[in-house]
Amino acid sequence: YLRETGLRVVFYPFILMDIQEGNGLADPWTGAANQPSIPWRGRITLSTAPGGHGSPDKGSGAVEQVSAFFGSAKGTDFNPADESVAYSGPNEWSYRRFILHYAHLCAAAGSVDAFCIGSEMRGVTQIRGPNGRYPAVSELCELALEVRSILGADVKIGYAADWSEYFGHHP
């Protein structure tokens, strides 16, 4: 309906982490016994944040954790029908599954003008694997291609960086 009235539509998925007080989840940034409640998505990181003692940053463990976060869902794992989108892929609650589900919903609703594949995930985008590579950036590029295959060439696809990501990573 919005596009029919001449408005341009941007779909901006938002991660809200439902982590409550006293959660017993170790804080990967500080080592505290509990993670902050309802934290900002920019805090998503490795089991121990880069710079922390024992962090897997810069190693193959970082690549494995980033891969697990993104998951292995594919656009073909979804079946849009009527007013729903069924999923038949790997049994995972992953980032790819989240974004690809929304891409299919947008397509089923008549598409959008622009689609963000993520926003303000600096704790993920700054993770390094071996040889100074950034595995989350590679994952986001692959995800953008998959979203493109669902939404088509006319939809603008991007990532909404946090202000601290604009200038690149300077550890």
Give residue spans per PLM region.
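Substrate-binding cleft and catalytic face of glycoside hydrolase catalytic domains
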Residues: Y1-G132, V155-S164
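Active-site neighborhood of glycoside hydrolase catalytic domains
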Residues: G132-G158
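Distinct, well-ordered alpha-helical segments
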Residues: E165-P171
